């Protein structure tokens, strides 16, 4: 079952996300991929797959991904954020992670959780249907 996945990474985490994406290219190519600007360009180049690119995170890209979550257009977020280097758009990062919690969206913030998400039989076989809160 094809899903829409957002892939986002802070500058110091971009190489890690690219390595992870290359390891999981066979699974990623089955899905619609969206990303913030710079990360999306790097992913397109490395994977040779189509990636819908939004603005760079500090220029509103995190908020654009957040809008997809609120509109029910995203199935999971893989967000390798950097907890050791503060970013000028940290409030946007917090808002994005908050939306994942509000809308019960699966989110992976490191390679361990991303591995578990992308290799889960529930995810791969489309057996998991997340409960979307009604407000």
UniProtKB/Swiss-Prot annotation:
<dbReference type="Pfam" id="PF02142">
    <property type="entry name" value="MGS"/>
</dbReference>
<feature type="active site" description="Proton donor/acceptor">
    <location>
        <position position="62"/>
    </location>
</feature>
<dbReference type="GO" id="GO:0005829">
    <property type="term" value="C:cytosol"/>
</dbReference>
<feature type="domain" description="MGS-like">
    <location>
        <begin position="1"/>
        <end position="135"/>
    </location>
</feature>
<dbReference type="InterPro" id="IPR011607">
    <property type="entry name" value="MGS-like_dom"/>
</dbReference>
<protein>
    <recommendedName>
        <fullName>Methylglyoxal synthase</fullName>
        <ecNumber>4.2.3.3</ecNumber>
    </recommendedName>
</protein>
<dbReference type="InterPro" id="IPR018148">
    <property type="entry name" value="Methylglyoxal_synth_AS"/>
</dbReference>
<dbReference type="GO" id="GO:0019242">
    <property type="term" value="P:methylglyoxal biosynthetic process"/>
</dbReference>
<comment type="similarity">
    <text>Belongs to the methylglyoxal synthase family.</text>
</comment>
<dbReference type="InterPro" id="IPR036914">
    <property type="entry name" value="MGS-like_dom_sf"/>
</dbReference>
<dbReference type="GO" id="GO:0008929">
    <property type="term" value="F:methylglyoxal synthase activity"/>
</dbReference>
<comment type="function">
    <text>Catalyzes the formation of methylglyoxal from dihydroxyacetone phosphate.</text>
</comment>
<feature type="binding site">
    <location>
        <position position="14"/>
    </location>
    <ligand>
        <name>substrate</name>
    </ligand>
</feature>
<dbReference type="InterPro" id="IPR004363">
    <property type="entry name" value="Methylgl_synth"/>
</dbReference>
<feature type="binding site">
    <location>
        <begin position="56"/>
        <end position="57"/>
    </location>
    <ligand>
        <name>substrate</name>
    </ligand>
</feature>
<feature type="binding site">
    <location>
        <position position="10"/>
    </location>
    <ligand>
        <name>substrate</name>
    </ligand>
</feature>
<keyword id="KW-0456">Lyase</keyword>
<feature type="binding site">
    <location>
        <begin position="36"/>
        <end position="39"/>
    </location>
    <ligand>
        <name>substrate</name>
    </ligand>
</feature>
<feature type="binding site">
    <location>
        <position position="89"/>
    </location>
    <ligand>
        <name>substrate</name>
    </ligand>
</feature>
């Amino acid at each position: 079952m094809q899903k829409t996945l957002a892939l986002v990474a802070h500058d110091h985490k971009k190489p890690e996300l690219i390595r992870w994406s290359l390891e999981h290219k066979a699974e990623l190519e089955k899905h619609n991929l969206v990303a913030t600007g710079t990360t999306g360009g790097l992913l397109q180049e490395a994977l040779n797959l189509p990636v819908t690119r939004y603005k760079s995170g500090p220029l509103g890209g995190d908020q654009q991904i957040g809008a997809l979550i609120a509109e029910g257009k995203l199935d999971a977020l893989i967000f390798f954020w950097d907890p050791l280097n503060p970013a000028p758009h940290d409030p946007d990062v917090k808002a994005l992670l908050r939306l994942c919690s509000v809308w019960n969206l699966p989110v992976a913030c490191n390679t361990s959780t991303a591995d578990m998400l992308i290799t889960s039989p529930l995810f791969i076989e489309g057996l998991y249907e997340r409960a979307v809160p009604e407000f």
